[in-house]
From Swiss-Prot:
Protein name: Plastoglobule-localized metallopeptidase 48, chloroplastic
Keywords: Chloroplast, Hydrolase, Membrane, Metal-binding, Metalloprotease, Plastid, Protease, Transit peptide, Transmembrane, Transmembrane helix, Zinc
InterPro entries, A to Z: Peptidase_M48
One Pfam family it belongs to: Peptidase_M48
Positions bound to Zn(2+): 191, 195, 240
Gene Ontology MF terms: metal ion binding; metalloendopeptidase activity
Cofactors required: Zn(2+)
GO cellular component terms listed in the entry, alphabetical order: chloroplast membrane; plastoglobule
UniProt xrefs under CDD domains: M48_Ste24p_like
Species of origin: Arabidopsis thaliana
Gene3D superfamilies: Metalloproteases ('zincins'), catalytic domain
Transit peptide: 1-47
A single GO BP: regulation of leaf senescence
Length: 344
């Protein structure tokens, strides 16, 4: 990813709240979730099999090769709210220059060492199954695969860091890997790749600093007006919808992505096999109905206006609707079937 400013890009996905990172002063989210969904094909990488109280992951392979989007452009799947809000942000005078002044090489180096120094680099010779999931997801989205690190943490999370002049990388926590099936984990990686594919760049950095709220610059909160903060949060929510679409392009099954959001809302490994995607989609429709009245609309707006991510039920409804759209079906028609099936 080519970032236009010398600034870190931190993508903290699938979260509503966070805990403080001591060394950086950033808040990292407490939860991230993808849950299993029914698929017509199996997945490269890890399958999940329950043995007693434990989930044992076993290598599996796709029964059908995935579709590849060789000529895929970011605007082919970018959410219209993402397009609209990005244009509004670009129209704010001096914001890009402010980013250069605020986020310098010191911040870059701290974040780089914080992530790399405490993690395991994934490669063909290190966690090769996970490496295969990333490489395939990047191939499907027509993007160069970034580096991938696994970090020991009890907090399920995944995020992306892109630093000007350096190769971007994704970090996943060990607890997230334990929580997910291979399909879900690859969808998480695809979501993170979506941020790189769409060059979300400095806007994502600003939004994360504002929403995570712990960047140690004196009087930072007073330097940005509330209207700008609201605009950045609105953009960040729309960017997440875009990256959910990237997850669908890789999963190629909407139930995989919807079940991700269901687990985010209220799932854990011990009850994963009892979760019902169709019931969760019905719940999303009931939320729309409940918030359709004037009072419901006001409550819904108050509930979501300060969030960095859309509500899980709204994301589920959005991705379900897009999976049935002409736009998505047109992309599938343009895609080519991968010629071979890999086993990892």
């Amino acid at each position: 990813m080519a970032v236009s400013v010398s600034a870190p890009v931190l993508s903290l996905c699938y979260n509503q709240s966070g805990e403080l990172s001591r060394s950086l002063g950033y808040r990292l989210p407490k939860k991230v979730g993808f849950s299993s969904g029914r698929r017509s094909v199996s997945y490269i990488g890890f399958g999940a099999e329950k043995v007693g109280r434990f989930r044992v992951r076993v290598p599996i392979c796709r029964a059908v090769p995935p579709l590849l989007f060789k000529d895929l452009d970011a605007d082919d799947f970018r959410h219209p709210f993402d397009k609209q809000n990005t244009l509004l942000l670009r129209a704010i005078p001096g914001l890009n220059e402010f980013g250069k002044a605020l986020l310098g090489s010191m911040t870059e180096q701290i974040m780089l060492l914080e992530n790399i120094g405490t993690s395991v680099l994934v490669s063909k010779n290190q966690l090769s199954d996970l490496h295969g999931l990333l490489v395939e997801a990047a191939e499907i989205l027509n993007i160069e695969a970034p580096d991938l690190y696994v970090r020991q943490s009890p907090v399920p999370n995944a995020y992306t860091l892109a630093i000007s002049g350096k190769k971007p990388f994704i970090v996943v926590h060990t607890s997230l890997i334990e929580l997910l099936t291979s399909a879900e984990l690859q969808a998480v990686l695809a979501h993170e790749l979506g941020h790189l594919k769409c060059d979300h760049g400095v806007w994502l950095t600003f939004a994360n600093i504002l929403t995570l709220g712990a960047y140690t610059v004196p009087a930072f909160g007073q330097m940005i007006a509330r209207t700008l903060e609201e605009q950045l949060l609105r953009w960040l929510r729309s960017a997440e919808l875009t990256c959910d679409r990237a997850a669908l392009l890789v999963a190629q099954d909407p139930k995989v992505v919807v079940s991700v959001l269901m687990k985010l809302a209220g799932g854990c490994p011990s009850i994963a096999d009892q979760l019902n995607v169709d019931a969760f989609l019905e719940q999303a429709r009931s939320y729309d109905k409940a918030s359709s009245s004037p009072l419901g609309w006001y409550i819904r707006n108050a509930q979501t206006s300060q969030l960095s991510h859309p509500l899980p039920v709204l994301r589920a409804r959005e991705i379900d609707e897009w999976s049935r759209s002409l736009e998505y079906k047109s992309l599938l028609k343009r895609a080519n079937r991968k010629s071979t099936v890999q086993k990892v």
